[in-house]
Amino acid sequence: MKSFEHLEKALELLFDQKAINKTNPKGIAHANSLIASGDVKEPSSWEHPTAEMENAYLEANGWDEFSKWYLGVDTEMGAETKGHYGYVYTSDFKTVDRQGLRAIRQRAAQNGMTSIFAAAGKMIEKIDAKK
């Protein structure tokens, strides 16, 4: 079972890198708002939310709220599909995860998404400035 969970997580990360082709203004605004209010987590490692966590959050809050936790979108996919969203910056749907932003920068650089790379970098700078 454990190896299946690792495979599932690897596939989620692979799909997260799919065809994200645009920044998500709602996600960027929400992340900046959380950073301004101090709702930031600084764990030593990054944990992508599980599919179960995503599904539970989506069922409880709907697509509009779900969309706020992602810095990028794939405009080729419907807005009410998980495939539409990428570059998640939270591990708990409550806080901005600093290590998640670092992971986003790395993936965005690999995928040539300079606007997402820059947005995540500015967020990290804001977090670090509050220390």
Description of each model-found segment:
Residues 2-131:
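Extended terminal accessory/targeting regions
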